[in-house]
Amino acid sequence: PIRSPCVAWPREILYDELRRFVGVLMPRADGVPLGVFAFHAELLKKQFPSWTRYDLTRLCLNLSEAVHTLHRYGVILGDLHPGNVMVSSDGSVHWIDADSFQVEDYPCSVGTERFRAPEFHGNYGDFLRTRSHDTYSLSVLLFMTLTFGLSPFARQGSEEEMQEAARKGVLPYPFASYKPPAGFYPPDTPGRYVWSYLPRKLRDALGHNLTCVQRRDLRPRVM
């Protein structure tokens, strides 16, 4: 069993009076789905009025730790996105929809396009995913949480151009020795300025994970 507050692990198998299986007893995962509030400043203020940038940072740390915990148990989330994680007012997180988790040789058969690692090809259930795939999805999720919903590959241009940039791992933000190609500019939104205020090590880690397309084995396990 996974003994961690970030996962509602089944406590008991339930049967009817004829000893037929009817379900499982699980702890309640309280909170609000991350995608409901975190990507808009107004919604965040409405949901958690006392939260500041400090609380968002703490939330990101808790998300990273929760993914790391599951990886230690050999579990790959697979379909990691803001709709399958519940957030409480104290910043604690609970992963839900665990029926799509990849456990041992049972693949995750679903996925969410925006959080899909660019090296994916074919149907989701045709291959086993790795920690590296989760790390990519987590990096997108952390970036969007810190920038109030701005996609890391969003740029001044069309939606098709953003998708192509994600496929090739081309960011419109500089980090380490990486410089964006000519003409790649972030969209003119408040979130674009967050990048320059992030600690250098965090910028480098996120940038590396999001642009490491050809050599995905070089992505760290988790941040």
For each predicted feature, which ranges?
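Catalytic-loop of the protein kinase fold
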Residues: 67-88
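Conserved end of the kinase activation segment
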Residues: 120-132
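A conserved short helix/loop substructure at the end of the activation segment
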Residues: 195-197, 209-222
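Conserved C-lobe activation region of Hanks-type protein kinase-like domains
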Residues: 142-203
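Structural motif at the C-terminus of the N-lobe alphaC helix and the adjacent alphaC-beta4 loop
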Residues: 1-7
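Conserved structural core of kinase catalytic domains
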Residues: 7-59
